[in-house]
């Protein structure tokens, strides 16, 4: 998910007015509405990142994980993104790398920065004030509040990208079967 504005609706899905109408109708029908919040990252088109990437000394300069290159110009660690490739992307304006656990278009927020935490709490309050009943928190396992120096992951010559490990398959089968039990049309 690429979040460009944490307090707006993706225009593909309508407007805030449309959302308010949906929310009111759902509540009139006795339904509760939950929305996704992605606290770990945002879009590289979000105003927070657009400002942060401009320089090392603006008000949001440390809202993301920015790290100088190694002496040879390479990425600061050997970390890989979940979607393949390096977890670091070079930003020529800052002459630094930024961390992204997923896509380069999804830079990780820096939870070591209290202003980031406050901004995310403000986002939650914004949606609660609109009447949202709850949230599904996405990608929380990738929240990173550590600070440099970052360390390389140890080499793992046996690592293979592939299907779900055998020992995890029974649990996910059980999860799938439970969902089908309650919703047989799935």
Locate predicted features.
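Acidic/aromatic-lined carbohydrate-recognition and catalytic surfaces
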Residues: 4-125, 129, 141-186
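Hydrophobic residues within beta-strands of alpha/beta enzymes
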Residues: 135-137
């Amino acid at each position: 998910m690429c979040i460009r504005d944490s307090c707006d609706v993706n225009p593909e899905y309508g407007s805030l007015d449309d959302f308010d109408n949906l929310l009111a109708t759902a509540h009139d029908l006795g339904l509760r509405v939950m929305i996704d919040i992605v606290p770990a990252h945002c879009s590289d088109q979000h105003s927070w990142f657009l400002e942060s990437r401009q320089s090392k000394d603006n008000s949001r300069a440390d809202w993301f994980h920015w790290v100088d290159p190694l002496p040879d110009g390479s990425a600061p660690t050997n970390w890989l993104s979940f979607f393949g490739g390096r977890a670091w992307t070079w930003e020529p304006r800052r002459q630094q790398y930024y961390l992204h656990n997923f896509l380069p278009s999804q830079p990780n927020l820096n939870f070591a920065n209290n202003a980031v935490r406050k901004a995310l709490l403000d986002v939650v309050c914004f949606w609660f004030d609109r009447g949202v009943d709850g949230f599904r928190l996405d990608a929380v396992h990738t929240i990173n509040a550590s600070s440099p120096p970052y360390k390389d992951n140890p080499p793992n010559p046996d690592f293979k990208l592939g299907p779900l490990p055998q020992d995890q398959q029974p649990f996910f089968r059980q999860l799938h079967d439970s969902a089908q039990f309650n919703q047989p049309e799935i």
